[in-house]
Each structure stands twice: as structure tokens, then as C-alpha cells.
Amino acid sequence: MTIKSNTPAHDKDCWQTPLWLFDALDIEFGFWLDSVASDKNALCAHWLTEVDDALNSEWVSHGAIWNNPPYSNIRPWVEKAAEQCIQQRQTVVMLVPEDMSVGWFSKALESVDEVRIITDGRINFIEPSTGLEKKGNSKGSMLLIWRPFISPRRMFTTVSKAALMAIGQGVRRAA
């Protein structure tokens, strides 16, 4: 059974990653570019917006690339991430729904180095209209990680939501 979303159409693909999650991953990867952002929700000092047309432009970056793609059409973002990882010689980390039954996941397995499943809870994304975390995500989340200088290992790893939250919230408290 498919769960229908009550999110207005204009907000469906504009949800922001919670800061605690981004901060925890930023410690590990050192993000320089947010390749799917708006001027309101960019998480890096450098970002691409819808106007920049990220699917048809280069993701020039001097550090790792963060990508939380529109969930309505993930496949082209998977293809672009694989391409830009090699072209930019930078790690690309993509946050996606944990759904291994879809075609874009099979496509990702052709080139991804790591699939990191976030366990023990679902991510509450930031609603575009309110700026607040909203509960009720219908799926878990996982990270697809492309690394430029190794042959893809297609490894599956896990990390708990609680561990990421503790690290990420610690960053905010220390700042």
C-alpha cells in the first residue's frame, strides 16, 4: 500500500536535511558544496540552486559534495553524482529514502562505494513552509557514498540515528 503525502506540491521537493544530521556527516566528510539547495536551505558555504540547473552543470568543488535530491525523481541525481565524483575528484554523499526495491538503487550499485543505512529511527526533515522538523517520514533513510580514487566496493554499513544525532547536536552546542 502506498502512503499518500499531504505535502503541498510546491513544497514536495524542498525539504531540508536536519542540521544535526548534516553536522555529524560534515565532520567525517568536510563538505564544500551543497549540490541541491535553495538560497533558504543551503547547508554549505557554496551551493547550487534550481536556477543553476545542477543536473546540467558541473559541481565544481574543493571538498566533499552534499546531495539531498528531490525524492520525486532520484535516478538522474544518482547518475550525476557518479559522474561528478569522478570529474571533480571529490567524494559525493547523497541522502535518500531507504528503498532497495527501486531502479535508481540498482543504478547506484553500479558505481557507489558505500551504502550506509541509518538505523534505529527515521529522519524528521525540515518542512519548507515552517522551518521546523516534521515527524511522520514514511521510510527510513540511507546514504549513498561515492569515492573518487577507489574501485567501488559496494559495501553496506550501518550507523544509528542516535549516534549521528549525538555527534551533530554536540557540534551545535560547542559552537
For each of these PLM feature ranges, what is it?
Residues 1-175:
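Class I S-adenosyl-L-methionine-dependent methyltransferase catalytic core
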